Swiss-Prot record:
It comes from Rabbit fibroma virus (strain Kasza). One of its GO terms (cellular component) is virion component. Belongs to the helicase family. Poxviruses subfamily. Its EC number is 3.6.4.-. The keyword Hydrolase applies. It comes from the Viruses. This is Transcript termination protein A18. The keyword Transcription applies. It is found in: Virion. It holds the Pfam family ResIII.
Length: 478
């Protein structure tokens, strides 16, 4: 259980530094999730993960006693490359120090996309030799964990049919590893069971959760805190450090050649009745999250045609072979899918549709294919999609925050046989009402990809055409 006490000025200041001015929410002594105000006389549950960092004064010693040992006999360590071994060495040293100083054994593994967080975490799982729960945000991530866990030869159970079905299964069967989706944590009985019977908890893609929200995960970490806990992410949320405050971060030295191709094209103005109607909402509250910006971009036929022509040409010339095309809206996704199917047929073109339950099977099939175009949304494929062989990313949408951009670019930053990785951007639009918005968001992608992720911007691609100016100059020279 987390520590329940009054939040004095020092502790309040420590907690607030993770929130960038946002309000602080915690569970009070009555287990209600409320805002914490300065000088409050109420008692609040303070997540024990906060004290995993030695810079935070330890209010009460945490005596970690792990009794749930793994039962498998012939356990093996997965193979790691040197930098992964370096991370393991840092983590194990830190965990021993936490144990000896009576601090909670909590750590965030802040490692770049493509580093191999999954296999590194499985190695640590074998080091601890304690029963483990692996929690993922969605079913799509389960397969990559299954593959990694099998390398250890630990027994495991995968739960995809709901927590009730899993609880029935656990009455007659046990396993060293449970792989679950985070929805399972809404069941209090299940939370108590894994707290009592499993010692290690691995939270994959921890940035997907805002732990300042009153969620099942927030409750679990507060009232059923694991004895050993790892958060895995390439783009950590600062506020989540309140629940897991110690971070290991190792920069990856990569042999990949990462290219950023910006395809510029100056279009003649284009509009339709549909576009004009939607443009009326651009400067209203309805466009707070730029939904109309993306809807209008979906209708930009000249830009869409340029994207299809560019990708088709590169794919035919085999300068790109395993391509993911990312959009924001489903209508945009089906447009590109239909166009690419006309060009190359269904043997090469696949749809990453979140509404289709067979999409995970499609993703698995792509692991063995030499050439394909995979069209999907940023919601489905922006985080956790595990197709290491991808060599190209085509970004068709505009509105992405910094975390989404880094996660999206990470889809093509994984080590594979192909060391040449290419990202395509299309910063121009034929629709004048969204010209500046598209340019602004494209600049953000360029900045993160070059300054933070090591992409090199290549010479500007495409054809620049300004028909009105061309006609004017032509008439002057006659």
């Amino acid at each position: 259980m987390s520590v329940c006490l009054e939040v004095d000025y020092t502790l309040y200041t420590e907690l607030k530094k993770f929130l960038n001015g946002q309000p602080l929410f915690l569970f009070n002594a009555d287990k209600n999730y409320v805002e914490v105000v300065p000088s409050s006389t109420l008692k609040f549950y303070i997540p024990i993960g906060l004290f995993s960092n030695s810079n935070v004064a330890l209010i009460r010693p945490v005596h970690t006693t792990c009794t749930n040992h793994i039962e498998s006999v012939d356990v093996t360590f997965p193979n790691l490359y040197p930098l992964q071994k370096h991370v393991v060495a840092e983590v194990t040293t830190s965990m021993r120090q936490k144990l000896s100083t009576h601090r909670p054994m909590y750590m965030t593994l802040h490692l770049s996309c493509g580093f191999g967080k999954t296999v590194t975490a499985c190695y640590l799982m074998v080091v601890h030799r304690r029963k483990t729960v692996i929690c993922v945000p969605n079913k799509m991530l389960i397969h990559q964990w299954k593959v990694a866990v099998e390398l250890t030869k630990l027994s495991y159970i995968i739960s995809t049919d709901g927590v009730s079905m899993l609880l029935k299964q656990l009455r007659t069967k046990t396993a060293d590893v449970l792989i679950i989706v985070s929805r399972h944590l809404s069941n209090d009985y299940f939370c108590k069971k894994i707290h009592d019977e499993y010692d290690t908890f691995i939270l994959d893609e921890s940035h997907m959760y805002n732990l300042m929200n009153n969620s099942a995960l927030t409750k679990f970490l507060t009232f059923y805190p694991p004895r050993i806990c790892y958060f895995l992410t390439a783009t950590p949320r600062l506020m989540n450090r309140i629940y897991c405050n110690d971070v290991v971060n190792v920069l990856k030295v990569s042999a990949l050649t990462k290219r950023l191709k910006i395809v510029e094209y100056f279009f003649e103005p284009y509009s339709t009745d549909c576009i004009r109607q939607m443009a009326k909402h651009l400067n209203t509250e309805n466009n707070k999250y730029h939904i109309y910006t993306e809807k209008i971009l979906t209708e930009d036929l000249p830009r869409n045609n340029l994207i299809v022509e560019t990708v088709s040409r590169e794919f035919r010339n085999e300068t790109i072979e395993r391509v993911i095309v990312i959009v924001k809206l489903r209508k945009h996704m089906t447009f590109f899918y239909d166009r690419f199917v006309k060009e190359f047929g269904t043997d090469y073109v696949y749809l990453g549709d979140a509404k289709n339950k067979d999409t995970s099977t499609v993703v698995k099939s792509l692991l063995q294919k030499k050439k394909f175009i995979f069209v999907s949304t940023s919601h489905y494929s922006g985080t956790g999609l595990d197709i290491p062989s991808l060599d190209s990313l085509v970004i068709c949408c505009a509105v992405l925050n910094s975390m989404q951009i880094e996660q999206l670019l990470g889809r093509v930053c994984r080590e594979s046989e192909s060391v040449k990785k290419t990202v395509f951007l299309f910063p121009n639009t034929s629709i004048r009402e969204i010209k500046h918005s598209l340019g602004f968001f494209t600049e953000r992608i360029v900045s993160i990809s070059t300054d933070k992720l090591g992409f090199e911007q290549e010479g500007i691609e495409g054809t620049k055409e300004e028909p009105v100016l061309t006609k004017a100059f032509s008439s002057q020279t006659r």
